[in-house]
Amino acid sequence: MKKISKLTTALALSLSLALSLLGPAHAAPDTSVSNKQNFSTDVIYQIFTDRFSDGNPANNPTGPAFDGTCTNLRLYCGGDWQGIINKINDGYLTGMGVTAIWISQPVENIYSVINYSGVNNTAYHGYWARDFKKTNPAYGTIADFQNLIAAAHAKNIKVIIDFAPNHTSPASLDQPSFAENGKLYNNGRDEGGYTNDTHNLFHHNGGTDFSTTENGIYKNLYDLADLNHNNSTVDTYLKDAIKMWLDLGIDGIRMDAVKHMPFGWQKSFMATVNNYKPVFTFGEWFLGVNEVSAENHKFANVSGMSLLDFRFAQKVRQVFKDNTDNMYGLKSMLEGSATDYAQMEDQVTFIDNHDMERFHNNSANRRKLEQALAFTLTSRGVPAIYYGTEQYMSGGNDPDNRARIPSFSTTTTAYQVSKKLAPLRKSNPAIAYGTTQERWINNDVLIYERKFGNNVAVIAVNRNVNTSASITGLVTSLPAGSYTDVLGGLLNGNNLTVGSGGSASIFTLAAGGTAVWQYTTAVTAPTIGHVGPMMAKPGAAVTIDGRGFGATKGTVYFGTTAVTGANITAWEDTQIKVKIPAVAGGVYNIKIANSAGTSSNVHDNFEVLSGDQVSVRFVVNNATTALGQNVYLAGSVSELGNWDPAKAIGPLYNQVIYQYPTWYYDVTVPAGKTIEFKFLKKQGSTVTWEGGSNHTFTAPTSGTATINVNWQP
């Protein structure tokens, strides 16, 4: 456990010495590797499996698919799961404070070598799946994957898999022999290909131009065979496949291309995960520079998964890499995103990845990367470091941003920044769960405070690498005392003296300087930091993490419904496990009261589902609208808004699968339940319901369905 930085009393020094003599403390439940729902205390390291380490040359592809020199970055280079195991066991990952790895999609990919514009391409990246129930042999066998899970867990590292259920592989409707025709296999059984698709496994609507959300969902991404999630075979297959990987012991899922799959189907997918073996899940929804998307926020708040925080990444790159914005822009991003995302602590922050040019380029000042990394590691959300960032890898867009890692040096400054700061996420709950407050700012300097209970971390960053800054008038929540820079001056930071009322002495923050000061203390009042998953049915398990819960069972509240006794399956000072009570579907606030009756803060936006979920396509014909009007769907279950127009599903689509005046939408609804519903038209605050009796429909118990009705005048 990280020691308290305050150095004012002999008692503190004696306590620190005693703790050091005791050795590593048993991990608190909320920080344990076994906590699959909460990654707020973790640092993720994203590994492009083929580009990391070749631990078993015997599984390398042969022939034109392989380039052992990694000169053609579109071919396999040899990285595999054994290579990752080796780097886990030699301490490279644990040495930089990594507690979770995100690996390439592990499923079997196509074996074809595809020639695009005279250049051979392979599925080295893992995104050209053929069988979601088998492994990619270039990465390893099922046994190798199980060994990876075991090796990671033995070193307190969680394992996240990339998962791309949007599509299979490249295909051409005009050339059935192109590549592998996008074929989908079910544990070796051929389910069908893109051409002669008699089972309707795929969409056949052409390629997306990205002009609308609907266009991006129901048309192909480039030449990738787009799976039809409204097909019961596809739906069941993908849900069974993820169950297989959950059974193998994964701790998290990164969902590829969530903007390009039906939102209702994805919510039913997450309900399946959460009701089976819930794990932390986050999706990829790309946002460009300065792009703020209400659809993106809504998805993160209601889908049951969080997102890669592109808004964070783009702003950090502007401020530290490109110098196209300043610290006020960074502050604005932090404040705006905290309002827009209901679970800010679950959004995954980063500075670069495999779909962006690398943060560092050969001519750049390395300090810019080091500061961006320090900012990410101490900011809200779950930080993810792209492999090789710690080695200052450079490279433009795909595939140059996916080169083989050049070395595994543990002495680079970037590696040391992670080594020193990553452990704070487990030792100081202010970093994992705390609020964020700006304490001092100008164009080049930002000093911000993270706080949880009386635990505090203060971070000062001067992005100007040429000019120091005199810091006067800084007030923090740190108790009076002297604080050492957690980085130990690695980024030219200084120590800090704080007087009464949190007032800091005047100091100079060096050019390009970054300092981190922190204080930890026990939290005595019950304080919730994290709840996961944030969506499940009654009877499912929910994990509540935080501090100050006490050792004796108290009460958990879902709204006004109290849960006590055997329905609380675990109660420790930092973690509670509870079964969702038999309440009606809807959104609830969660809070706890300890055994003495002291109430915690409220954690809001928890969705209780009405039961197991299935994806249903609702279609309404002849729904003509005036300019500015849109069609929505409401009904008798919480998943359809319980007849509340403000919570109605929509606006519905009318361009791709069906065309105006027919409207449609894929929605998750309770399986096997008879549902009443109607469509309505909305324009601003004006609502027009369709006439006649309510439509009635009984949802299937599994698979998918389509319900098609006419608008009732």
From Swiss-Prot:
Region annotated B sits at: 166-229
What is the protein's species of origin?
A: Bacillus sp. (strain 17-1)
Cofactor binding mode and count: Binds 2 calcium ions per subunit.
UniProt keyword annotations, A-Z: Calcium, Disulfide bond, Glycosyltransferase, Metal-binding, Secreted, Signal, Transferase
> Per UniProt, where does Ca(2+) 2 bind?
N166, I217, D226, H260
Q: What is known of its domains?
A: May consist of two protein domains: the one in the N-terminal side cleaves the alpha-1,4-glucosidic bond in starch, and the other in the C-terminal side catalyzes other activities, including the reconstitution of an alpha-1,4-glucosidic linkage for cyclizing the maltooligosaccharide produced.
Report residues binding substrate.
Y127, W128, H167, N220, L221, Y222, D223, R254, K259, H260, H354, D398, R402
What is the protein's given name?
Cyclomaltodextrin glucanotransferase
Gene Ontology, cellular component aspect: extracellular region
**Single GO term (MF):** alpha-amylase activity
- Renumbered residue ranges of the record's region C: 434-522
Q: What positions does the domain CBM20 occupy?
A: 608-713
In the record, biological process GO terms are: carbohydrate metabolic process
EC number, as in UniProt: 2.4.1.19
Residues at the site labelled Transition state stabilizer: D355
Annotated region (D), positions in chain: 523-609
Class of enzymatic activity (EC top level):
transferase
